[in-house]
């Protein structure tokens, strides 16, 4: 087998090696969320389909696949169908630059951090197109809310990424992880980590910032007119973005695949396992926040983004760069 033939086999295999575990992770993340929320609310949660409800994601998936796809008569059909596919594809494409272990990455770009930021910014287009093409006032209002919310919090996320970038001197995600061998950035930059995680909640439209799909006022928001696989793709995209943002928190602040302590017994555990454990920790925080906190008002959400996080993240950029220059610690 020549080199070209090997490449045609290896590249799709690597892509499937990322997509299939991600889809499985999304399926069982939904189950985990329902179980954790049930525990918080002192009830059982799903436990009928399979042992301990383990087959519940399969039943939910089959239900959505077998439903009839209904489109509004006044909708723009091509854009209406394209929007959920675009949203889901963007959530998958972002994983190309995420390193699970040293060397275990599909494409180790030198601008990996910038690439992830660009992909997360493009996600708003799928939502805007979905709201506009549905030709429904509720869907369009939800889409406008989502666009305003995502753009607002992308500003503070960008400044936080600059703070980490100043500490490392590189946009390569593998180099950012290796720079945390002595100390994780989450320890000296703990307030930045908290701001970044809260901004990720707003960026992924998760509670308590799920204003775009506020059921009480917007009847589920931008995806109100979607059924069957259209709704399922938006759903999968949201949860895939949750896992992606948890992975980004892990890479930037918790040392990625590096073990918790620099001990021989911990070094025997594969880096991908450490990475997964840290991602699961952030996913648990996502679920816990949803179960524990009420939804913000829209003006409170915007005020938090522009009046609190923007000046704070800007102040951290200035203070971190000042400390590094003063003590000659610049990379």
Curated annotation (Swiss-Prot):
It comes from the Eukaryota. It is an enzyme of class 7 (translocase). Keywords: Electron transport, Membrane, Mitochondrion, Mitochondrion inner membrane, NAD, Respiratory chain, Translocase, Transmembrane, Transmembrane helix, Transport, Ubiquinone. Its main location: mitochondrion. It catalyses: a ubiquinone + NADH + 5 H(+)(in) = a ubiquinol + NAD(+) + 4 H(+)(out). Its EC number is 7.1.1.2. Pfam families: NADHdh (PF00146). The chain crosses the membrane at residues 11-31, 85-105, 111-131, 157-177, 183-203, 243-263, 269-289, 308-328. One of its GO terms (biological process) is aerobic respiration. InterPro entries: NADH_UbQ_OxRdtase_su1/FPO (IPR001694), NADH_UbQ_OxRdtase_su1_CS (IPR018086). One of its GO terms (cellular component) is mitochondrial inner membrane. It is a multi-pass membrane protein. PROSITE patterns: COMPLEX1_ND1_1, COMPLEX1_ND1_2. It is found in: Mitochondrion inner membrane. One of its GO terms (molecular function) is NADH dehydrogenase (ubiquinone) activity. Core subunit of the mitochondrial membrane respiratory chain NADH dehydrogenase (Complex I) that is believed to belong to the minimal assembly required for catalysis. Complex I functions in the transfer of electrons from NADH to the respiratory chain. The immediate electron acceptor for the enzyme is believed to be ubiquinone. HAMAP family: NDH1_NuoH (MF_01350). Exons b and c and d and e are cis-spliced, while trans-splicing reactions are required to link exons a and b and c and d. Belongs to the complex I subunit 1 family. This is NADH-ubiquinone oxidoreductase chain 1. The gene is ND1.
């Amino acid at each position: 087998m020549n080199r070209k033939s090997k490449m045609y086999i290896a590249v799709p295999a690597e892509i499937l090696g990322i997509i299939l575990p991600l889809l499985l992770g999304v399926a069982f993340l939904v189950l985990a969320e329902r179980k954790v929320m049930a525990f918080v609310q002192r009830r059982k949660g799903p436990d009928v389909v399979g042992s301990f409800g383990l087959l519940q994601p399969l039943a939910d998936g089959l239900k959505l696949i077998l439903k009839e796809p209904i489109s509004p008569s006044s909708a723009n059909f091509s854009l209406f169908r394209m929007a959920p596919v675009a949203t889901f594809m963007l959530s998958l494409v972002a994983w190309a630059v995420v390193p699970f272990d040293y060397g275990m990455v599909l494409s180790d770009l030198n601008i990996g951090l910038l690439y992830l930021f660009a992909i997360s910014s493009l996600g708003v287009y799928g939502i805007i197109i979905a709201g506009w093409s549905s030709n429904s006032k509720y869907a369009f209002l939800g889409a406008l809310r989502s666009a305003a919310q995502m753009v607002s919090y992308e500003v503070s996320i960008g400044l936080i990424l600059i703070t980490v970038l100043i500490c490392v001197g590189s946009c390569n995600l593998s180099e950012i992880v290796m720079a945390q061998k002595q100390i994780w950035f989450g320890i000296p930059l703990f307030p930045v980590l908290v701001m970044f995680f809260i901004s990720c909640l707003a960026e992924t439209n998760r509670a308590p910032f799920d204003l775009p799909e506020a059921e009480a006022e917007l009847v589920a928001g931008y995806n109100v007119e979607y059924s069957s696989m259209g709704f399922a793709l938006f759903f999968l995209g949201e949860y895939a973005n949750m896992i992606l943002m948890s992975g980004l928190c892990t890479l930037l602040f918790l040392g990625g695949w590096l073990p918790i302590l620099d001990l021989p017994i911990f070094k025997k555990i594969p880096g991908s396992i450490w990475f997964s454990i840290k991602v699961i920790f952030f996913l648990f925080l996502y679920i816990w926040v949803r179960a524990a906190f009420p939804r913000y008002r829209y003006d409170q959400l915007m005020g938090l983004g522009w009046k609190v996080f923007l000046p704070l993240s800007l102040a951290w950029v200035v203070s971190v760069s000042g400390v590094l220059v003063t003590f000659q610690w610049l990379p």
